[in-house]
C-alpha cells in the first residue's frame, strides 16, 4: 500500500515536470510593454473623450443621461444655457479611478458627444489626477461621427434658418393635409 502511494506520487511529479518542459519551448506571450506596442482590439473601450460638432461647438447638451446610465456613478455634470438657448455643461467631470469602462455612457448619449477611445495609458501616482474635467476631456475633432450634428438632425431651429431649411432636413408636414 505504501509502495503504491510512492509510485503514484512519483508519477504525478513526472507528469507535472513533463507539462512544464513541454511549455518551455512554446513562444512567449509576455511583452516588454513600453518598448513593444500592445495590440488593442478595434472595439476596445478605453479613455472617454468629449467631441465637438463639425461647426466646432461642443456636442454635449447636458441631458444627464450619461450620469444616469453609469453603474458606478463616476460622471457628474451641471447644465447651463447659452444666450441662444442651447444647453451646455457648465462642468463635466469623470472620475477614472471609479470608471469600469463599460461603455454605457457612450450608448446613452443622444448627441454622440461621449466616445470611448482605444487609449489605455492612464496610470497616475495620485488619485486626484484621475479626475478629469471638461477641458481635459474635450478634443478638437468630431471623433467617430464626423458629419453628425445633433441640432441639425433633431430638427431644432438654427439661427438664421427656419425649420426645414437646414441640411438633411425636410419641411414640416401639415398633418391636416394628410387626412382624406
From Swiss-Prot:
Catalytic activity: a quinone + NADH + 5 H(+)(in) = a quinol + NAD(+) + 4 H(+)(out)
Cofactor: [4Fe-4S] cluster
Cofactor binding note from Swiss-Prot or TrEMBL: Binds 2 [4Fe-4S] clusters per subunit.
Residue segments, region Disordered: 161-180
Binding locations of [4Fe-4S] cluster 1: 60, 63, 66, 109
Enzyme class: translocase
Membrane topology classification: Peripheral membrane protein
GO MF, any single term: 4 iron, 4 sulfur cluster binding
Biased composition (Basic and acidic residues): 161-174
Gene3D superfamilies linked to this entry: 3.30.70.3270
Enzyme Commission numbers on file: 7.1.1.-
Residues binding [4Fe-4S] cluster 2, per UniProt: 70, 99, 102, 105
InterPro entries: 4Fe4S_Fe-S-bd, 4Fe4S_Fe_S_CS, NADH_quinone_OxRdtase_chainI
Pfam family name, one: Fer4_7
Keywords: 4Fe-4S, Cell inner membrane, Cell membrane, Iron, Iron-sulfur, Membrane, Metal-binding, NAD, Quinone, Repeat, Translocase, Ubiquinone
One Gene Ontology cellular component annotation held by this UniProt entry: plasma membrane
Any one GO biological process: aerobic respiration
Keyword Metal-binding in record: yes
Subunit-level organization: NDH-1 is composed of 13 different subunits. Subunits NuoA, H, J, K, L, M, N constitute the membrane sector of the complex.
Function: NDH-1 shuttles electrons from NADH, via FMN and iron-sulfur (Fe-S) centers, to quinones in the respiratory chain. The immediate electron acceptor for the enzyme in this species is believed to be ubiquinone. Couples the redox reaction to proton translocation (for every two electrons transferred, four hydrogen ions are translocated across the cytoplasmic membrane), and thus conserves the redox energy in a proton gradient.
PANTHER family in alphabetical order: NADH DEHYDROGENASE [UBIQUINONE] IRON-SULFUR PROTEIN 8, MITOCHONDRIAL (PTHR10849:SF20), NADH DEHYDROGENASE UBIQUINONE IRON-SULFUR PROTEIN 8, MITOCHONDRIAL (PTHR10849)
Protein's UniProt name: NADH-quinone oxidoreductase subunit I
Gene encoding the protein: nuoI
Amino acid at each position: 500500500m505504501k509502495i503504491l502511494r510512492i509510485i503514484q506520487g512519483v508519477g504525478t511529479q513526472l507528469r507535472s515536470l513533463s507539462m512544464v518542459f513541454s511549455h518551455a519551448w512554446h513562444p512567449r506571450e509576455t511583452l516588454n510593454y513600453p518598448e513593444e506596442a500592445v495590440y488593442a482590439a478595434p472595439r476596445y473601450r478605453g479613455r472617454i473623450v468629449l467631441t465637438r460638432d463639425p461647426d466646432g461647438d461642443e456636442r454635449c447638451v447636458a441631458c444627464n443621461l450619461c450620469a444616469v446610465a453609469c453603474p458606478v456613478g463616476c460622471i457628474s455634470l451641471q447644465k447651463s444655457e447659452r444666450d441662444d438657448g442651447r444647453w451646455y455643461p457648465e462642468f463635466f467631470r469623470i472620475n477614472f479611478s471609479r470608471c469600469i469602462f463599460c461603455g454605457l455612457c457612450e450608448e446613452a448619449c443622444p448627441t454622440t458627444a461621449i466616445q470611448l477611445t482605444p487609449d489605455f495609458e492612464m496610470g497616475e501616482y495620485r488619485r486626484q489626477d484621475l479626475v478629469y474635467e471638461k477641458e481635459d476631456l474635450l478634443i478638437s475633432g468630431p471623433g467617430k461621427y464626423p458629419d453628425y450634428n445633433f441640432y441639425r438632425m433633431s430638427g431644432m431651429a438654427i439661427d438664421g434658418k427656419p425649420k426645414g431649411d437646414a441640411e438633411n432636413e425636410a419641411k414640416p408636414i401639415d398633418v391636416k393635409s394628410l387626412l382624406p
